[in-house]
């Protein structure tokens, strides 16, 4: 009989191990659960480090000059992250099997179903019940840390790569409420999500009557840029026709397929500047680039990622790139409208003195040129009713530099 029992154990070693695990004393089960929780904590730490390495590889790969090393590093870290996540799933299953985390407990009103320790008449179960209580709390803490790590990774991705839409660009309701309250106190309108180009253009023309807004497809804008005269004349009859020029045409029933082709928005202030905004994808309200040019410039370099030959507009373009990223950080609902309204604040680029030093012209340290205030505050101008509230700064006086 003993020989038969030994042969059965040799034939089913896995089943024997499971039976032994189930028959372990409570202290040993708790020790195993705590060890698995420690393993989960180490895996979570590896996941957080891997997320930072992936972000670093993505940032290096986005630079103009880079080798294949960032791509190899990204692939290696991606495989490592997948393995860590798989290990974390296996540890979680083991914790569920040991009774630390169970579906029945998590489905109750208490998030993790943690109960007060059981007190038996002889007091034998008291210590084990307390240890199980602590193990359950540690399991909940491990899951919370994982959730926080994934949230930190998502926040960093949205900060450094805002063009990657993960569907999570929604502000908390409390934050929106506070922002709305501050805007109303400062004489500004409450934020509204402008979902279509006609709505944005109509609202902009009402607030800034002096601006001329035109929209184009990418090919039409290329023809328009190449046909612009190299003089101060800005007669639209000398260039190719835009898709539409006025919001009245939009409201009169512009076809949807025409709007879907709009990829370039031109804001023009006669004798001041011309701003080019690119939309990606075409027909959306998601800006991805912006550039400023002189009204007398023309050529193929006039596009949203180009640079003017004049220092003034080149400096404004560099500053506009920062403002664009700021507006995109608040979601695509108001990013385009806020950007266009901020661009209109440069109508006083050659007449408004610096808010900090009070002078109109000052020496720019980087370029060694005498320039007007080329920075406009964008942090507090999401939906202002009056563009005069937008403060002007020289680059040396700008709050962004300080």
UniProtKB/Swiss-Prot annotation:
Q: Name one GO cellular component term.
A: mediator complex
Keywords on record: Coiled coil, Nucleus, Transcription, Transcription regulation
Q: Where is this region: Disordered?
A: 1-30
Disulfide bond annotation, renumbered to this chain:
none
The residue ranges flagged as biased composition, category Polar residues, are 1-23
Which InterPro entries did the record assign?
A: Mediator_Med27
Q: Which domain of life is it from?
A: Eukaryota
Q: Which residues form a coiled coil?
A: 28-49
- Pfam families hit by this protein: Med27
Q: Where does the record say this protein resides?
A: Nucleus
Tell me which family the UniProt entry assigns to this protein. Belongs to the Mediator complex subunit 27 family.
Free-text function comment from the UniProt entry = Component of the Mediator complex, a coactivator involved in the regulated transcription of nearly all RNA polymerase II-dependent genes. Mediator functions as a bridge to convey information from gene-specific regulatory proteins to the basal RNA polymerase II transcription machinery. The Mediator complex, having a compact conformation in its free form, is recruited to promoters by direct interactions with regulatory proteins and serves for the assembly of a functional preinitiation complex with RNA polymerase II and the general transcription factors.
PANTHER family given in the database record: 34 KDA TRANSCRIPTIONAL CO-ACTIVATOR-RELATED, MEDIATOR OF RNA POLYMERASE II TRANSCRIPTION SUBUNIT 27
Q: How does it assemble?
A: Component of the Mediator complex.
Query: Under which name does UniProt file this protein?
Result: Mediator of RNA polymerase II transcription subunit 27
> Which organism was this protein described from?
Arabidopsis thaliana (Mouse-ear cress)
């Amino acid at each position: 009989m003993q020989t038969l029992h030994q042969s059965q154990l040799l034939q089913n070693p896995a089943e024997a191990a499971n039976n032994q695990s189930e028959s372990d004393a409570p202290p040993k089960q708790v020790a195993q659960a705590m060890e698995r929780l420690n393993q989960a904590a180490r895996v979570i730490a590896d996941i957080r480090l891997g997320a930072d390495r992936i972000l670093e590889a993505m940032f290096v790969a986005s630079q103009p000059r880079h080798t294949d090393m960032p791509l190899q590093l990204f692939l290696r870290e991606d495989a490592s992250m997948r393995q860590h996540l798989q290990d974390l799933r296996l540890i979680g299953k083991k914790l569920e099997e040991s009774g630390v985390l169970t579906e029945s407990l998590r489905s109750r009103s208490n998030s993790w179903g943690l109960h007060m320790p059981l007190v038996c008449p002889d007091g034998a179960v008291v210590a084990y019940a307390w240890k199980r209580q602590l193990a359950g709390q540690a399991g909940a803490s491990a899951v919370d840390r994982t959730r926080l790590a994934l949230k930190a990774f998502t926040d960093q991705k949205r900060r450094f790569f805002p063009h990657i839409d993960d569907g999570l660009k929604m502000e908390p309701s409390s934050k929106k409420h506070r922002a709305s309250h501050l805007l109303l106190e400062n004489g500004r309108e409450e934020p509204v999500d402008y979902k279509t180009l006609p709505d944005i253009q109509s609202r902009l023309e009402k607030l800034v009557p002096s601006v001329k807004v035109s929209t184009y497809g990418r090919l039409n804008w290329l023809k328009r840029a190449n046909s612009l005269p190299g003089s101060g004349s800005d007669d639209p009859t000398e260039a190719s026709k835009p898709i539409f020029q006025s919001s009245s045409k939009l409201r009169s029933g512009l076809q949807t397929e025409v709007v879907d082709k709009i990829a370039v928005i031109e804001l023009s202030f006669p004798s001041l500047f011309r701003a080019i905004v690119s939309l990606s994808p075409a027909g959306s309200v998601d800006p991805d680039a912006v550039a400023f040019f002189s009204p007398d410039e023309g050529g193929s370099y006039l596009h949203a990622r180009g640079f003017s030959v004049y220092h003034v507009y080149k400096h404004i373009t560099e500053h506009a790139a920062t403002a664009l990223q700021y507006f995109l950080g608040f979601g695509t609902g108001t990013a385009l409208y806020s950007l266009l309204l901020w661009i209109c604040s440069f109508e006083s680029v050659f007449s408004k003195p610096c808010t900090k030093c009070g002078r109109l012209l000052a020496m720019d340290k980087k370029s060694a040129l005498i320039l007007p205030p080329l920075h406009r505050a964008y942090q507090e101008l999401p939906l202002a009713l009056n563009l005069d509230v937008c403060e002007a700064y020289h680059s040396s006086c700008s709050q962004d530099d300080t």
